[in-house]
Amino acid sequence: MSGQQTTTHQPWPGVIAAYRDRLPVGDDWTPVTLLEGGTPLIAAPRLSEQTGCTIHLKVEGLNPTGSFKDRGMTMAVTDALARGQRAVLCASTGNTSASAAAYAARAGITCAVLIPQGKIAMGKLAQAVMHGAKIIQIDGNFDDCLELARKMAADFPMISLVNSVNPVRIEGQKTAVFEIVDALGTAPHVHALPVGNAGNITAYWKGYTEYHADGLIDRLPRMLGTQAAGAAPLVLGEPVSHPETIATAIRIGSPASWTSAVEAQQQSKGRFLAATDEEILAAYHLVARAEGVFVEPASAASIAGLLKAIDGGWVARGSTVVCTITGNGLKDPDTALKDMPSVSPVPVDAVAVVEQLGLV
């Protein structure tokens, strides 16, 4: 309309463009991006009321492929393309494969995925297949797959390994911290997150320490990493030969980022906890029904661990806490479908429906 000005809102540009001065990218590199990052930090009022803490959820399941992996993958694939590599390779139980395949498709290069035998969340694998990844099942567990992937990348330089052992993955993943601090204006007292391969706790601690070194925050959080009880090598202090848990994304017996994760825990005066599958599923249902956030089981580990830490007195009432929700619940619909109630028909009658709802 003439005489009126319109307001133009610039879209989120993706994590490389948003934080380029804090990332190891060449001036002439063109980011391979799906506009990842910029995910919401959602207040959790019911969890806050229940615990006496101020809890926020960093909902990384709203990244383009449904998990936090996209932050690191935009960096890894951008780096591979800039170096002239022709393929990316990962060992994955799901989320990494989905992200690697999507970003490889975006870049126009080959993606190969090594998957272990056993339980795989098919929603994640379906994503990789749709993006054209070559899926290879290995007669072994995740750790066997990762060891093979490392060897392949070392022997064939045209292939880039894009698991979190690739340091540029960590660089991309640390940007979630920048967003959290930019939103809160400070660091939380405690940051809770699930721990599988341990790249994320490594990345988050790196982000916090960089902001602190630059004077952008005046405190550092304690890092609270939760592992599944059946896959808790960092809690036990030794590898787990046969990890087992319903939370497939953290079913890892020997984390690739073990050393740096322990450093993050020790330097932050943090803690590793183990949560049983029952505790993880209880948290999975709680966050969905109390806060309206649908998470995959591994993400619920951060909530389960936090509740245990609060009950045990390790997290003081009144603390500000951020929980990282690493993946979307749609990644693993089978777990949710196990709760499907039996459905009985009611008459085509408003009163009958209201009675069924228990409202009268």
From Swiss-Prot:
CDD domains for the chain: Thr-synth_1
Disulfide bridges in this chain: none
Pathway: Amino-acid biosynthesis; L-threonine biosynthesis; L-threonine from L-aspartate: step 5/5
Chemical reaction(s) catalysed: O-phospho-L-homoserine + H2O = L-threonine + phosphate
Enzymatic class: lyase
Record: residues binding pyridoxal 5'-phosphate: 95, 196-200, 326
Known partners and oligomeric status: Homodimer.
PANTHER family, alphabetized: L-THREONINE DEHYDRATASE CATABOLIC TDCB (PTHR48078:SF6), THREONINE DEHYDRATASE, MITOCHONDRIAL-RELATED (PTHR48078)
Superkingdom per UniProt: Bacteria
Its biological purpose: Catalyzes the gamma-elimination of phosphate from L-phosphohomoserine and the beta-addition of water to produce L-threonine.
Residues bearing the modification N6-(pyridoxal phosphate)lysine: 69
SUPFAM superfamilies with a match to the protein in the record: Tryptophan synthase beta subunit-like PLP-dependent enzymes (SSF53686)
InterPro entries per UniProt: Ser/Thr_Dehydratase, Ser/Thr_deHydtase_PyrdxlP-BS, Thr_synthase-like, Thr_Synthase_bac/arc, TrpB-like_PALP, TrpB-like_PALP_sf
PROSITE patterns: DEHYDRATASE_SER_THR (PS00165)
Keyword Heme set for record: no
Record's keyword terms, sorted: Amino-acid biosynthesis, Lyase, Pyridoxal phosphate, Threonine biosynthesis
Protein name (Swiss-Prot/TrEMBL): Threonine synthase
Cofactor(s) for this UniProt protein: pyridoxal 5'-phosphate
Family affiliation: Belongs to the threonine synthase family.
EC annotation from Swiss-Prot or TrEMBL: 4.2.3.1
GO biological-process terms attached to the record: isoleucine biosynthetic process; L-serine catabolic process; threonine biosynthetic process; threonine catabolic process
